[in-house]
Amino acid sequence: YQICKAFRDDPVTSLHNPEFTIVEWYRPSFSMENLMNEVEEYVQTVVSCGKILRYSYQEVFEEKIGLNPHECSLDEIQKAAYTHLDIGSKDLRFTEYLDLVMSEVVEPNLPEFCFLYDYPECQAAMATIEIDDHGNQIAKRFELYCKGKEIANGYFELTDPIEQLRRLTSDNIERSKKGLPEIPIDERFFAALSAGIPKGSGVALGLDRLLMVMGDFEEIDSVLSFSIKRV
């Protein structure tokens, strides 16, 4: 595990500062569900929230949007975005429409404290993909939301070096299309995967955002010693 600074060059908002603090840990032989239990116990030690509710990504998406995110087409998710949001005529990929609808329509209506789990395959990132009881390919990934804030992001980790390389290559192709620099291959990471590492789960939790929840703050600036606004 480690507690460290992380950096992400996204727009500055009430929830995001380019430099922020995370606690990240990995559990060999832990399932995704095991790690969700541990994250819940961790949060309950500092926040009075009771039992944290759990919903599949499909469950909340179907309830609010009326579409199965694992089966709907690009046209269907595009239509849903245009129906619920004033976004003009954007030409986005399927996963980008999913992100947009989830963040702008679904997330604001989530309970105060809840987990979302089993994400669409296209949003697997570095999570393992499995087949659910309905034959859908789902990413074994979860996120924790507290009072409207995404607090944690966890995976049942992908340990297959061939699949990891395929995903990185695919991501770099998309980055090149957008004029973004490619992400270099981490040779030591792939060497470790090739040597064989145990299956398990890992999570990154935003400590600044957790402090916001603990203190009922609306601005991340309120819990930082030196935010980008005051540099």
Sequence positions of predicted segments:
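A translation/RNA-centric and nucleic-acid-associated enzymatic feature enriched
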Residues: 1-37, 41, 68-231
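Acidic, low-complexity central loop/insert segments
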Residues: 32-57
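Short, conserved secondary-structure transition motifs
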Residues: 51-70
